[in-house]
């Protein structure tokens, strides 16, 4: 158990401002066979990031962009140490646009060598938690990014090492994270890192990792899953039409108090001891009734405001987002050729 002094030492240096923003998906997939078979939206693959995304986020008052990336956008697992420079230049431009528009950029490995949260769908030739080769490749990539962006202040750029770790022990996860952080800090000692909690029935922080200097502890806002991923073909959720509050069984009703218990409380001790906490992903897929989604979002946003946690909606453009979400029950506004969910945007801007 990490002590309070260690946790205080591990908090993000200079306590970053409250970040509010979005996930941008251009590097989320590398080839059509990753997610596109389940949802055509995920067919957006290894494309350049889009400058107007940064401009619009800044115009609306947001200051954060998380880039969830598949390592296969820059490398082939058959030749993993050969890195495609063209892909890195795409990422360079996103980092530069972050500076231009005052938007913090967070690089994330959503698919790392040997691990994806969707392992059942996305087969890997290694296991990141047990295979040294996968761990060496993982550290090689993070060191490469650290060297490439050395000198860019952490106020502008952070590294979120692994998306939603699961199917591993806390000790296995800690070993991989510490190796990744060491590889980053060898090249760039001051780089801020973001560390996801372990995924299971609920998201739990690994308190020992909260003691890593200049780190942020990341959680999620996907609860209850039956509401946030209603009818999502990759999620296997019940077909019960969501309401908010939402009764899951005779004895369980999800409401604001349950959100606090399940999603805030596990991180409250760390936050009270000085750790910075951030919600790296959250949102509702487009089959959840719009009014229900907005009511649920308001409760989560108000809770995060109370504890001063920042957040990044999944996503800006797409089925969870404020642009081009393709909801059947929304009257969209034309925004430069895109369909804008103005009601959802204004709700986000309140907080």
Q: Residue spans of the language-model regions?
A:
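Short, solvent-exposed turn/loop segments enriched in Gly/Ser/Thr/Pro and often Arg
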Residues: 68-71, 109-116, 197-199, 312-321
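Mature N-terminal segment immediately following signal peptide/propeptide cleavage
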Residues: 17-26
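Active-site region of glycoside hydrolase catalytic domains
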Residues: 18, 119, 123, 128-253, ...
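Aromatic-rich peripheral "rim/lid" segments of glycoside hydrolase catalytic domains that contact
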Residues: 289-351
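Acidic/histidine-rich helix-loop elements
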Residues: 25-49, 78-83, 123, 127-132, ...
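N-terminal export signals
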Residues: 1-14
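Short, acidic/polar
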Residues: 42-58, 138, 262-266, 297
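Aromatic-lined substrate-binding rim segments of carbohydrate-active enzymes
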Residues: 49-114, 176-177, 181-188, 293-304
């Amino acid at each position: 158990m990490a002590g309070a002094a260690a946790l205080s030492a591990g908090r993000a240096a200079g306590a970053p401002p409250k970040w509010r923003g979005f996930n941008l998906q251009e590097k989320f997939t590398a080839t059509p066979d990753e997610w596109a078979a389940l949802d055509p939206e995920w067919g957006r693959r290894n494309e350049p990031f889009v400058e107007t995304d940064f401009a619009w986020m800044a115009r609306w008052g947001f200051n954060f962009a998380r880039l969830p990336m598949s390592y296969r956008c820059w490398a082939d697992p058959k030749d993993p140490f050969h890195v495609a420079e063209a892909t890195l230049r795409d990422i360079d431009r996103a980092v530069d646009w972050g500076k231009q528009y005052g938007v913090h950029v967070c690089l994330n490995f959503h698919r790392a060598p040997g691990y994806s949260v969707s392992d059942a769908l996305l087969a890997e030739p290694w296991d990141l938690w047990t295979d040294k080769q996968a761990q060496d490749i993982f550290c090689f990539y993070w060191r490469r990014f650290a060297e490439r962006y050395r000198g860019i202040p952490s106020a502008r750029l952070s590294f979120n090492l692994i998306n939603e770790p699961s199917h591993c022990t806390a000790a296995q996860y800690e070993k991989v994270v510490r190796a990744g952080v060491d590889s980053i800090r060898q090249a760039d000692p001051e780089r801020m890192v973001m560390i996801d909690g372990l995924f299971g029935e609920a998201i739990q922080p690994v308190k020992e990792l909260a003691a890593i200097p200049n780190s942020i502890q990341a959680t999620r806002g996907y609860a209850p899953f039956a509401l946030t991923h209603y009818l999502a073909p990759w999620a296997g959720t019940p077909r019960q039409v969501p309401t908010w509050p939402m009764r899951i069984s005779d004895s369980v009703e999800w409401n604001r108090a349950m959100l606090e218990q399940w999603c805030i409380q596990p991180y409250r001790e760390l936050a009270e001891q000085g750790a910075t906490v951030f919600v790296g992903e959250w949102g509702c897929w487009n089959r959840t009734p719009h009014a229900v989604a907005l009511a649920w979002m308001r409760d989560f946003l108000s809770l995060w405001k109370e504890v001063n946690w920042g957040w990044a909606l999944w996503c800006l453009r797409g089925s969870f987002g404020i642009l081009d979400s393709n909801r059947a029950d929304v009257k969209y506004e034309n925004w430069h050729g895109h369909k804008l969910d103005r009601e959802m945007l204004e709700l986000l801007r309140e907080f």
